[in-house]
Amino acid sequence: MHRRAFASSATLGLGATALPLAGPVAAQGGTAPRPTTLGGAITDVPGIRVGHFTDTRRPTGCTVVLTEEGAVGGVDVRGAAPGTRETDLLDPSNLVEQVHAILLSGGSAFGLDAAAGVVRWLEERGFGFPAGPVRVPIVPAAILFDLGVGNPAIRPNAASGYQACEAASAGPPVEGSVGAGAGATVGKLFGMARAMKGGIGTASVRVGRVTVGAIVAVNAVGDVIDPASGLVVAGTRTVDGRRGPGAAAAILQGDLPPALQPGMATTIGVVATDAVLTKAQARKLAQMAHDGLARTIEPVHTLWDGDTMFTVGTGRSGLPGNMMVMGVLAARVTASAVLRAVLAAKGLSGPELPSVPAASEIG
């Protein structure tokens, strides 16, 4: 069977079926079919709540994935310019087993301050790792670079993280230009003048009694590609502003990009499951989730990206995870979340902002 036909098959093994895929429809403003993606959201995983804070002063914000009661955490960092917090603690050889939230934030390294607000929110409610007379909330975090969009002095802080927690819900989170995806852009190998809008997206799939979901803030230096067709969904535009064949195609034709500053991009996300995981399994699942980034972003894991994927396992199903199956699902939901992020995004325009169209706005 052809690889793509197999990938879109409803049957994924273990006698169970995946959630149906959305059918292709005509893309707004163009003739290419809309990419096929999984439905659902990371909040379909029991024990997961998500909240966004979106700054109204410029496009930036943060997104919190709450696991207040504790979840086994893992992480895998593949980009060369990451900005992270508490990732060493997720090493399987280290002590603490569970995390209480994961924060994704804009604002580059400044945005890591938002994690302090998440910690305060959790502490006020008595959640955290028991350490003598106190409970210490464990909140790993990762950031993306959006300081080139509007006033760079405006970035997420502790109050932003706290507000994201206050907004958290078990319902489907809003996608597109919100939270950590508010200032995200993609297709920047040839500069912001030819870029398109990124965003944040989510998806999930259930096999048997186990659910796997993802949420991804897409701010890649590379292009977002539909893996089924190989076409650019959102990415480097032509010099005259049209949807182009992509940065990789341009490079192959000898059109080399200018020098870029490391850390100018970064895609970050979380994969969640209700399966029972060990820390080693959680880390492996985060590694396999990066396959979803590699299928939908080209190039990915570059010197200019700090691509980071977290995993949280709530264990609510009470079932051990089949790592082969869950790795397949983690890559699939991650890929779908990437596509949904740019499909739901809204373009940038206005005073002090670059003009950056979204996928829905150009042919």
Predicted regions located by residue number:
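N-terminal secretory signal peptides and thylakoid transit peptides that target proteins
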Residues: 1-14
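Boundary at the C-terminal end of the N-terminal hydrophobic targeting segment
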Residues: 27-29
